[in-house]
């Protein structure tokens, strides 16, 4: 039975395609594990929904992954982590559930001066979880919350470097370009897919970071702690599902997994 558990897949879910940026890090750090990814593109973006709606959709996603045999679950969505992680852990006490949050602490530690911009959904920036992060680390540096409604939709449509998304990001970031910006935190798992565009706009001196590595390190730690890590020496399997059940969205998912 323990061997079955070790070989069981790790479930990832997100409001759409963004969580693939976190899954990509897992494939890099733990290639021998099996994975299931569930993207809820039918209901994307979560960032414009109420906390109650986000919780309901998150419970549906976890039920899907558990029925597929997931041994652990990664909430690869900042918005869902903020709104639902506590309730999910309370309900599913027997399964490790790992969330993701804006990487504000490492962003502040990187530099002794300069402001930090946190790009995220409105829902993430207004939740208690982010307010707690601000209380903990915001006093050490100017932290600029920057809601980006509309950016998720570009990525869901596969527009990662077109003129429209470049203009959108330029309009968002231009008001801050006369300040000393030390780093930008990508507080939505969709946003790493447009990291190169952001870097071009702000310049190479600005560090751009996200929470993927920290989340996967925590996943690894929890699996080891519970003696659940795979002992296979072979590359694991990956199954991708999406609530849209659209062939194009699955093709785009596979393409995004391969982008470095």
From Swiss-Prot:
It catalyses: L-glutamate = D-glutamate. Gene3D superfamilies: 3.40.50.1860. Its EC number is 5.1.1.3. Pathway: Cell wall biogenesis; peptidoglycan biosynthesis. Pfam families: Asp_Glu_race. GO terms for biological process: cell wall organization; peptidoglycan biosynthetic process; regulation of cell shape. It is an enzyme of class 5 (isomerase). Belongs to the aspartate/glutamate racemases family. NCBIfam families: glut_race (TIGR00067). This is Glutamate racemase. It comes from Clostridium perfringens (strain 13 / Type A). The lineage of its organism: Bacteria, Bacillati, Bacillota, Clostridia, Eubacteriales. The gene is murI.
């Amino acid at each position: 039975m323990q061997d079955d558990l070790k070989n069981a897949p790790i479930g990832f879910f997100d409001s759409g395609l963004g969580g693939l940026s976190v899954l990509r890090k897992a494939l890099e750090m733990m290639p021998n594990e099996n994975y299931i990814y569930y993207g809820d593109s039918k209901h994307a973006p979560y960032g414009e929904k109420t906390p109650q709606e986000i919780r309901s959709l998150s419970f549906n996603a976890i039920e899907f992954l558990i029925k597929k045999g997931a041994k652990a679950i990664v909430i690869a969505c900042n918005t869902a982590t903020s709104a639902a992680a506590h309730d999910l852990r309370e309900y599913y006490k027997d399964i490790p559930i790992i969330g993701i949050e804006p990487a504000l602490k490492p962003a502040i530690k990187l530099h002794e001066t300069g402001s930090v911009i946190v790009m995220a959904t409105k829902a993430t920036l207004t939740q208690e979880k982010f307010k707690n992060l601000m209380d903990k680390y915001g006093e050490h540096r100017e932290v600029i919350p920057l809601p980006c409604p509309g950016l998720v939709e570009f990525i869901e449509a596969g527009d990662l470097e077109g003129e429209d998304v470049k203009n959108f990001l330029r309009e968002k970031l231009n008001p801050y370009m006369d300040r000393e910006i030390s780093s930008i935190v990508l507080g939505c798992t969709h946003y790493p897919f447009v990291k190169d565009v952001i870097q071009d706009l702000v310049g190479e001196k600005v560090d751009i970071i996200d929470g993927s590595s920290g989340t996967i390190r925590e996943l690894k730690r929890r699996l080891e702690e519970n003696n659940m890590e795979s002992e296979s020496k072979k590359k694991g399997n990956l199954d991708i599902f999406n609530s849209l059940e659209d062939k194009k969205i699955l093709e785009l998912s596979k393409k995004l997994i391969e982008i470095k």
